[in-house]
Swiss-Prot record:
Predominant place of localization: cytoplasm
Organism superkingdom: Bacteria
Lineage: Bacteria, Bacillati, Bacillota, Bacilli, Bacillales
Descriptive protein name: UvrABC system protein C
Cellular component GO terms, alphabetical: cytoplasm; excinuclease repair complex
Organism: Bacillus thuringiensis (strain Al Hakam)
Localization per Swiss-Prot or TrEMBL: Cytoplasm
Chain's gene name: uvrC
Length: 594
């Protein structure tokens, strides 16, 4: 341990706060919080740890800490620091999925919709539905039962839904506000948990229709009841109070945490969410960080109640989220928490087995690759590849593999700026120069190994820039392909010597994955640029189309093919004035032009 670390550890306060662990480049690699900073921070440098924590501790050369006045303040500060620094050892929930809602529009003739976009309009929203299929099945049932209009625009004549009895045809008939209100109220009652009452009313109407010998009507009502039963069978009641609540459980094993969330809506367990991640804190602290990020994401709506295990500070959760948080001691809620805990434990055991098997393979491949090349274990590998077609739209791509796995947030794309024509060597020089000049300037992590997709010329060009211009001495290897453009072997050293790997070895498979991934990333980027240039060149001669409108059209349609199939109205919808839309349409439909 560094001497200055011992000195800082000796004067840590016994107060709550946050700590920031830093590596040799001064980059924040982990942010944590603690009720007692002195105890928590010292624990990293004493006692035994699992492999993942050992890796973290091995990179720590300095730390900072911030004292807070309370545990709540520490939790809030921790989440803000994680967002600011994005440390590589912290969990950073980036769940961008949005859940569907059922919406009753506020139009004069209202409609029933499925939407993932909740707006501050006068519409009524019901949800969210973590299970999208459940939302669609419920809407389908309501469409059959309640005849609100279905068409987005009013047609000139009645549609099929009218003939099926699922629409009152406001397009050709007068449907009063009172009629719509009656239907909307019934839908609201159903969605608010009143399906039993609705079912009972339908059953009464079915018997009345049968007694009046209205057998067709009775059959329709019977079918509606059957649809209700089918939907509700999938959403069996587990709580009688109809309160919306999220029930949390968790398990910890071998430095990993699994959190299970049960979504209970209107008394029914409708879906669950499973998250698994490495943990470097005490389990309770890790759980609090997770739950803070879970609801900070807009796709997770806070229910009326949050139920947490007994080991968690429910008062802190309640104050932070401003939602009722409970720790049940008995009853159905406690049973649900225990069920969530049990599921978390089982999921962790199953997943951990797969992770262990996968990590053993990938880490061993990385270690063996280092041995074969005569270098330190290349935990971080960065690979480069160029792509162009006869010199047009030349691009390059860089990917990163960390611990033998793709680290996609580290990928970078480059448009070649200084090279004219198809010159692969100069393109490689430019990209390596740009990448590592920026890495030095911004203090970005440097790789343990650089792989250049190419032969001796590519390797020489990249090495010259790295060593003679930037003064960096990072192991660099060329990835040579065979005549079928498949991975053959590596070359390394000065002069470059071939390193032959066993074709059935894990390290060879790792190189294949690196080659395939960097090639895929580069060629995809090139095709995107090439497609854009084709569209833009096709639009160059159209009067009234400048760069701004080209970008609008490209963003809206995505391809020249879709533009050629579009109508004048669709060009207007894309933001073009009517006269410009007509000009574009005429130009693109002229066979002599394209």
């Amino acid at each position: 341990m560094h001497e200055h670390l011992k000195e800082k550890l000796a004067i840590l306060p016994d107060q709550p706060g946050c700590y920031l662990m830093k590596d040799k480049q001064g980059t924040v690699i982990y942010v944590g919080k603690a009720k007692v900073l002195k105890n928590r921070v010292r624990s990293y440098f004493t006692g035994s740890h699992d492999g993942k924590t050992l890796r973290l501790v091995g990179e720590i050369v300095d730390f900072e800490y911030i004292v807070t006045s309370s545990n709540l303040e520490a939790l809030i500060l921790e989440l803000n620091l994680i967002k600011k620094h994005d440390p590589k050892y912290n969990i950073q929930l980036k769940d961008d999925k949005t859940y569907p809602f059922i919406k009753i529009t506020a139009e004069k003739q209202p409609r029933l919709l499925i939407t993932r976009n909740v707006k501050k309009d006068k519409g009524k929203y019901f949800g969210p539905y973590p299970n999208a299929q459940s939302a669609h099945e419920t809407k389908k049932l309501l469409d059959r039962m309640y005849p609100l209009r279905k068409c987005s625009n009013m047609p000139d004549k009645v549609c099929l839904y009218y003939h099926m009895g699922q629409c009152l045809a406001p397009c050709v008939k007068e449907v009063t506000e009172e009629q719509n209100k009656e239907i909307v109220d019934e839908i609201i009652k159903f969605l608010n948990g009143g399906h039993k009452e609705v079912r009972s009313e339908l059953e009464t109407k079915m018997y009345e229709a049968s007694e009046k010998l209205e057998f067709e009507r009775a059959k329709e009502l019977r079918d509606q009841i059957a649809h209700i039963d089918a939907i509700m069978e999938k959403q069996k009641m587990i709580m009688s109070d109809l309160v919306d609540r999220d029930v949390f459980g968790y398990a910890v094993d071998k430095g990993w945490m699994c959190v299970q969330v049960f979504f209970v809506r209107k008394g029914k367990l409708i879906e669950r969410d499973v998250s698994m991640f490495p943990i470097y804190d005490e389990p309770e602290e890790g759980f609090l960080t997770f739950i803070g990020q879970f609801y900070e994401n807009s796709s997770h709506f806070k229910p009326k109640e949050i139920v947490v295990p007994g080991s968690i500070d429910s008062e802190l959760v309640e104050r932070f989220l401003e939602v009722e948080a409970t720790q049940p001691k008995r009853g159905k809620k406690k049973d649900l928490v225990e069920l969530a805990n049990k599921n978390a434990k089982i999921a962790l055991e199953e997943k951990f087995y797969l992770i262990e098997r996968d990590e053993e393979r990938t880490i061993k491949a990385v270690e063996n690759l280092g041995k074969q090349l005569g270098i330190e274990t290349p935990y971080r590998i960065e690979a480069f590849d160029n792509s162009n077609i006869q010199g047009t739209n030349p691009v390059s791509a860089m990917i990163a593999f960390i611990d033998g796995k793709p680290a996609k947030k580290e990928y970078r794309k480059y448009k070649i700026k200084t090279v004219q024509g198809p010159d692969d060597y100069e393109s490689m020089r430019e990209v390596v120069r740009r990448r590592y000049t920026r890495a030095l300037k911004e203090g970005l992590p440097l790789p343990d190994l650089i792989i250049i997709d190419g032969g001796k010329g590519h390797l020489a060009a990249a090495s010259d820039v790295l060593e003679n211009e930037l003064g960096l001495y990072i192991p660099m290897a060329g990835l040579v392909k065979d005549d079928k453009h498949k991975t053959s072997h590596l070359i390394i050293g000065d002069p470059p010597e071939p390193v032959m790997l066993e074709r059935n070895s894990q390290e060879f498979y790792l190189l294949q994955r690196v080659q395939d991934e960097v090639h895929r990333f580069a060629i995809t980027f090139h095709r995107q640029l090439h497609g854009k240039s084709v569209i833009q060149s096709a639009l160059d001669d159209i009067p009234g189309i400048g760069d701004k409108r080209k970008k609008v059209l490209l963003k809206h349609f995505g391809s020249l093919k879709k533009m050629k199939e579009a109508s004048i109205e669709e060009f207007v919808e894309a933001g073009m004035p009517k006269n410009v839309a007509e000009t574009i349409y005429t130009y693109l439909t002229d066979k002599k032009t394209l």
